[in-house]
C-alpha cells in the first residue's frame, strides 16, 4: 500500500467539515477536497465558511472534477449515504481506502457492497462536540477516530492509514474489536441523540444527575444494549457507564446531531436509532418502551416542521 497523500471528504456537515479543517491544516488545501453533487455544489461554492469564528477556505469539487483519492472519508448522514455512493464513485480508485464516520451499524456494509470490501476500513468517530449551523463550525473537543478491521487481509491498508494519521497528528486509535466499538457507539447514539432532540437540550442537560433527559437517555441505552447482546455483541454496563461519562466531558452548550436537526428543522436519523432498536426487539421478542416513546415523539416533532 502506497503512502496516503490526498483526501476526499463526502459530507460537509459538522464532522466532515471538522475533519477537513484538521487535515487541510496539515497537508494543504490542494490535497483535501469536499466532493458533492452539482446541486449541493451550486448551493455551497460561494459560501463563506467559518471554523470557531474564523473564515476558512475549503476546496469544493463536483464529480466531473473529482480524481481518484488515496483516502475517502464518508461523513454524510445515514439517510444520505445511498445517494452519496454515485457522487463519490469518480473518486474511488484501485488503491483508495474508504472510512465512514456515519452513525449506525451498517454503513460499511453498504460501502463494501458498492466498492468492494477490500477498500473499506471500519471506523467509529466519537467524543466530538462539533456544532454546525449555516456554514459555521464550532468545536472544542476534536474527539477520536477508532479504526479496525474484520478481515486480516486489510492489515496493510490499516497500517498505511495509521501511518498517515500519525504523520499529521490526527487523533485515532486502533481497535482490536471494532465491531464491539461500532455497537457501543450505536448504544450511545440511541440514548444521547434522541434524548437531546426530544428534550431540546445539549450535553449539559443529559449530564445532570437525576434529570429527566439523563434518565431517558440511560434507559434507551439499556434497551440498545439488550438488543445488541441478542445480536451477539457483548456490550456491558461498564461500556454504558463509560459512554455516559464521556458525554459529561463535552462542552455543555454543544449538542449532538439530532438536536441540531431539530433546530435546523431537518429530518433526523431516528430510524437508524430507535427504529433499529424496535426492529431488533421485535425480532428477539423484547419490549423497548423507552425507544418506542422516543420514536413516537420524534415523529411528532418532525411532523411540525
Task: Give each language-model segment a name.
Residues 40-45, 108-109, 155-157:
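Short, charged/polar "capping" segments at the starts of alpha-helices
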Residues 1-58:
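NAD(P)+-binding Rossmann beta1-loop-alpha1 motif at the extreme N-terminus of oxidoreductases
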Residues 52-136:
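Rossmann-like NAD(P)(H) cofactor-binding subdomain of soluble oxidoreductases
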Residues 36-38, 62-64, 102, 124, ...:
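Residues at the C-termini of beta-strands that transition into short coil/loop
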Residues 90-91, 114-119, 134-237:
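Internal alpha-helical scaffold of NAD(P)-dependent oxidoreductase catalytic cores
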Residues 4-5, 70, 143:
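Nucleotide donor/acceptor-binding cores
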Residues 21, 25, 86, 90, ...:
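Short, well-ordered alpha-helices that flank and scaffold nucleotide-derived cofactor binding pockets
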Residues 2-3, 30-31, 218-305:
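NAD(P)-dependent Rossmann-like dehydrogenase/reductase catalytic/cofactor-binding core
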